[in-house]
Curated annotation (Swiss-Prot):
Stored InterPro entries: AN34A/B/C, Ankyrin_rpt, Ankyrin_rpt-contain_sf
Family: Belongs to the ANKRD34 family.
Region entry Disordered, spans: 161-188
Keywords recorded for this protein, A-Z: ANK repeat, Cytoplasm, Nucleus, Repeat
Protein name: Ankyrin repeat domain-containing protein 34B
Location(s) in or outside the cell: Cytoplasm; Nucleus
Principal place of residence: cytoplasm
Biased composition, class Polar residues, residue ranges: 177-188
Cellular component, GO, one term: nucleus
Classification via SMART domains: ANK
UniProt repeat feature ANK, residue ranges: 9-38, 42-79, 83-113, 117-146
UniProt xrefs under PANTHER family: ANK_REP_REGION DOMAIN-CONTAINING PROTEIN (PTHR24156), ANKYRIN REPEAT DOMAIN-CONTAINING PROTEIN 34B (PTHR24156:SF1)
Length: 521
């Protein structure tokens, strides 16, 4: 109460004069040009101060006389302060009396206006227990066609008095707790309102927190269809059949398909689609399935199933190969190496989900087989031939044994070195393809003439054969040791198309290199 009476009068002389009920000083200020609706830092006007003040001395006039004079000088009774209260609300709060309330109502004060807490002058009149003021307010509402249907006053759990008002709209039975929700009502049928709607006509001061939507006809519960009933909104009748289902699916996550069932169905479909794969490819598929449990569904590329089956048949006729652990590890653990593929598969595309997974798995197998074919065609040690090529392999193995033998190398004969170089050139594939590995071996331009070594990093697919005689003289004289040197980088513009990669060394190659260094060194 003391907080309501507290008034700030330092910044405005008119407010100070009204607060002290100095009628003559107020008249002089208004005639001198003071603004009658000027407010203080709380947004309170002189009319509000006149309704709140309780200052009485020998020079002050009555509250009714001061308010009447202010209203005659065009004071606005419907201005709201920073808390949303009007002069009529302040009059009801401070028990200004029925005469003051009548003056305000006659000057156009609106009894249905509400403050920021949702209370109107009617609520404050009920809480102040002023029957005469309440009767005047009810009569004013009836005169304006706003008949008050119900005003209830209860005590909350904390002991405070709470008042509800309903203007022009009869209260719904659901608000008073007479109706209970249907037994088949799901949580998605309950609408939760967290903030009150903006009040335009002040027809309701308090609404329900939970609003039960109209249930389906199968449940046997029908909401009120009255235009003013708060249990039904007009726009809900125009909603289609799919929208409520989608809203219920998003609001009730327990209705969705569990991820374990999707994963189980995915594994079964993969097993049905890929029955003729090799054990190494089956290992890579199992590693991919482990990655599916931690990531979204991934897609490598788009390919038709018919094309994939055709490619698989082509590679099966050409001959099966065995994958190395590095290839399986790089293709299964690091599927993000391809930047052009889409990252995730949307869950909304459920009809094409299993089809896309099987296609991506087939494509990954085809891609690994294609990579292996290129790998074996570029490596002279890993190339396998069938038919008449087997005889050439046996001859090359015999010549390799001759090379490892120290006798022809110690003699330094020109014929043995030339025979070895010719044999190596016959086995060399002219379509040079690089491979990647873990070791870094620097080779000179003569390295590609020796068997058992990887192809050099040259741009020209048909490199010129250097003169072997010069190096044979160096070997026979023994003045220089055969040390591998870094290849010269060509300066042709075509070199941009080649990707320089490192070579890998096997134990057999390391032994050959050590034998050569012992012999020539």
């Amino acid at each position: 109460m003391d907080e309501a009476v507290d008034v700030t009068t330092e910044s405005n002389s008119l407010i100070k004069a009204v607060y002290q009920s100095r009628l003559r000083l107020t008249r002089l200020l208004l005639e001198g040009g003071a603004y009658i609706n000027e407010s203080n830092d709380r947004g309170e006007t002189p009319l509000m101060i006149a309704c709140k003040t309780k200052h009485v001395d020998h020079q002050s006039v009555s509250k009714v006389k001061m308010i009447k004079y202010l209203l005659e000088n065009n004071a606005d009774p419907n201005i709201q302060d920073k808390f949303g209260k009007t002069a009529l609300m302040h009059a009801c709060l401070e028990n200004a009396g029925a005469e003051v309330v009548s003056l305000l109502l006659e000057s156009g004060a609106d009894p249905s206006l509400q403050d920021h807490t949702g209370f109107s002058a009617l609520v404050y009149a009920v809480n102040s227990e002023d029957k005469e003021t309440l009767r005047i307010l009810l009569n004013a509402c009836k005169a304006k066609g706003k008949e008050v249907i119900i005003i209830t006053k209860d005590k909350s759990a904390s002991g405070k008095q709470t008042t509800r008002q309903y203007l022009n709209v009869p209260p719904s039975p659901g608000i008073e707790g007479n109706n209970s929700p249907s037994p088949c009502t799901s949580p998605s049928d309950i609408e939760l309102k967290t903030s009150p709607a903006p009040i335009s006509n002040a027809l309701e001061t308090e609404k329900e927190l939970f609003n039960f939507k109209e249930a389906a006809s199968s449940c046997g519960f029908k909401g009120s269809s009255q235009p003013g009933s708060p249990t039904k909104k007009p726009h809900l009748s125009h909603v289609g059949g799919k929208l409520p289902l989608l809203q219920r699916l998003h609001s009730e996550p327990w209705l969705k398909i569990p991820p374990s069932l999707l994963h189980q169905h995915k594994v079964s479909s993969l097993q049905e689609e890929l029955q003729d794969i090799t054990p190494d490819e089956e290992l890579s598929l199992q590693m991919n399935e482990l990655m599916f449990s931690k990531r979204y569904f991934t897609r490598h590329q788009s390919i038709d199933v018919k094309d994939a089956s055709h490619l698989l048949k082509t590679f099966d006729t050409a001959g099966a190969r065995k994958l190395s652990y590095d290839e399986i590890h790089s293709h299964s653990i690091y599927p993000e190496a391809n930047p052009n593929r889409p990252e995730t598969l949307p869950v909304d595309q459920e009809p094409d989900l299993m089809h896309s997974i099987s296609v991506s798995s087939l494509k990954s197998i085809v891609q690994r087989r294609n990579l292996g074919a290129n790998h074996y065609s570029s490596d002279s040690q890993l190339t396998t031939r069938a038919g008449p090529a087997a005889a050439e392999d046996s001859k090359s193995l015999l010549e390799k044994k001759k090379m490892l033998c120290p006798q022809p190398l110690l003699t330094g004969s020109r014929e043995s070195l030339e025979s070895i170089s010719v044999t190596a050139l016959s086995r060399r594939n002219h379509a040079i393809l690089e491979r990647r590995g873990s070791g870094a071996l620097l080779l000179d331009h003569i390295a590609h003439t020796r068997p058992g070594f990887l192809p050099p990093l040259n741009v020209n697919p048909h490199p010129p054969i250097p003169d072997i005689s010069i190096h044979s003289k160096l070997i026979s004289s023994g003045t220089k040791s055969l040390i591998p040197s870094a290849p010269h980088v060509p300066k042709e513009p075509k070199s941009k198309k080649m990707l320089l990669r490192r070579h890998s060394m096997h134990t057999e190659q390391i032994k050959q290199l050590m034998n050569l260094e012992e012999i020539f060194g």
